[in-house]
């Protein structure tokens, strides 16, 4: 399980940093043509900065495996909130089912790999 967990951290780290940097540099790539304006690009850049931070936290968990518990649970809470936002939008008929399903994958991976028991000292 340790190898799988470290793979999850590495994947989240690479995706978070890479996609976050892309959103910082080219936020209009995430928008439909004509939807880019000052507010939408600003919000996407902020989300990109958050993605970089989350990716760096995943890398920290990868490199500090024995001490990762509080950071892992913080990532788990974030993933739960992010997933709930998308499920709410789906239930209000504002999104297709693909959106909440895709946004539940990180939550499930973090839940499966969570260090529920503290490591012995």
Model regions: which residues?
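Short juxtamembrane and helix-loop transition motifs at transmembrane-helix boundaries
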Residues: 30-40, 60-69, 91
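Membrane-water interface at the C-terminal end of transmembrane alpha helices
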Residues: 107-121
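Core segments of alpha-helical transmembrane spans in multipass integral membrane proteins
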Residues: 18-19, 40-62, 77-81
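Non-cytosolic membrane-interface motifs at loop->transmembrane helix junctions
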Residues: 34-41, 94-105
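Membrane-helix boundary elements
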Residues: 2-41
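Alpha-helical transmembrane segments of integral membrane proteins
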Residues: 3-10, 14, 42-45, 69-73, ...
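Hydrophobic alpha-helical membrane segments
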Residues: 71-87, 105-110
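Membrane-helix boundary connector in multi-pass membrane proteins
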Residues: 62, 66, 83-101, 118-120
